[in-house]
From Swiss-Prot:
Record Gene3D superfamilies: Antimicrobial Peptide, Beta-defensin 2, Chain A (3.10.360.10)
Protein's name according to its UniProt entry: Beta-defensin 6
Example of a GO biological process term: defense response to Gram-negative bacterium
Primary location class: secreted
SUPFAM superfamilies recorded: Defensin-like
């Protein structure tokens, strides 16, 4: 039974740094500071970089 606690602690420690690197852009200020613009859809030479505070408004950055 003790091995389960050790295994859980090991997995928790190994996965905790990944949460910091998986966050997307979440505000218009952050989007613009990364060189993006807030639009309804990312077309052409733009790619999705996150959202601008609302799920339907996307932060689009050049590819």
């Amino acid at each position: 039974m003790k091995i389960h606690y050790l295994l859980f602690a090991f997995i928790l420690v190994m996965l905790s740094p990944l949460a910091a690197f998986s966050q997307l852009i979440n505000s218009p200020v952050t989007c613009m500071s990364y060189g993006g613009s807030c639009q309804r859809s990312c077309n052409g030479g733009f790619r999705l970089g996150g959202h601008c505070g609302h799920p339907k408004i996307r932060c689009c950055r050049r590819k």
